[in-house]
């Protein structure tokens, strides 16, 4: 009798192990990219970087050229040292669909030059202000991948922290690029909840280039497409 019980226990253990292997094989990794617009802010961007560093995650920062200077240089260098990537959000934040071609080119080129000078990298991505974009802008600019993102409208200064959290977590999905702003304290506070909650839901939080790499999808240059998801 004891022998039978031992054999049955061994069989049960084996079946449980197989079931667990099958279960883990079926679990597909989930990824989401964090991105922040309109910085660097002397006050709030360092606070945001602190939150990212404390949680061990990286993000993509879309910088406005007129905010890039000797005073904000240490913040930009810290982004790079943390493994975050630094991208283009134009020089003065105009609607690119409503300005002359020469100004569009100047807005992008000036910011590219500043980012190269202060971050040591040439931006691959462009997030047009207000995500305003069309085929003409894409053709004119060329050589850039246009990035959109899922926004909780956190640019609104009066928006409660709880609403920023809820609007993000209720709509997040695998492969999403999340769009925030590192220009106000309420978003900094919201990230203290959003990041742990995303991790608890099984998401790995990455920068935008890493999201595309992990998805196996290569985004297109010279394309009118705006990427809000990697796949």
Question: What is the predicted function of each stretch?
Answer:
Residues 21-27, 55, 68-69, 186-231:
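C-terminal domain-boundary segment and adjacent tail
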């Amino acid at each position: 009798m004891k022998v039978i019980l031992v054999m049955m226990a061994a069989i049960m253990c084996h079946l449980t192990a197989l079931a667990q292997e099958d279960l883990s094989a079926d679990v597909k990794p989930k990824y989401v990219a964090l991105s922040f617009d309109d910085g660097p802010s002397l006050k709030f961007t360092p606070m945001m970087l602190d939150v990212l560093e404390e949680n061990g995650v990286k993000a993509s920062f879309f910088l406005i050229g007129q905010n890039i200077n000797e005073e904000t240089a240490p913040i930009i260098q810290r982004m790079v040292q943390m493994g975050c990537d630094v991208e283009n959000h134009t020089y003065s934040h105009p609607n690119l669909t409503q300005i002359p071609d020469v100004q569009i080119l100047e807005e992008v080129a000036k910011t590219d030059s500043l980012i190269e000078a202060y971050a040591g990298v040439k931006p691959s991505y462009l997030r047009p202000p207000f995500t305003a974009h069309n085929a003409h802008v894409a053709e004119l600019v060329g050589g850039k991948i246009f990035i959109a993102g899922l926004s909780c409208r956190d640019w609104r200064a009066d928006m409660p922290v709880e609403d920023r959290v809820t609007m993000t977590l209720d709509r997040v999905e695998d492969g999403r690029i999340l769009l925030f702003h590192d220009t106000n304290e309420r978003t900094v506070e919201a990230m203290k909840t959003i990041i742990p909650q995303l991790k608890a839901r099984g998401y790995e939080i990455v920068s935008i280039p890493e999201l595309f790499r992990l998805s196996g999808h290569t985004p297109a240059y010279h394309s009118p497409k705006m990427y809000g998801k990697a796949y």
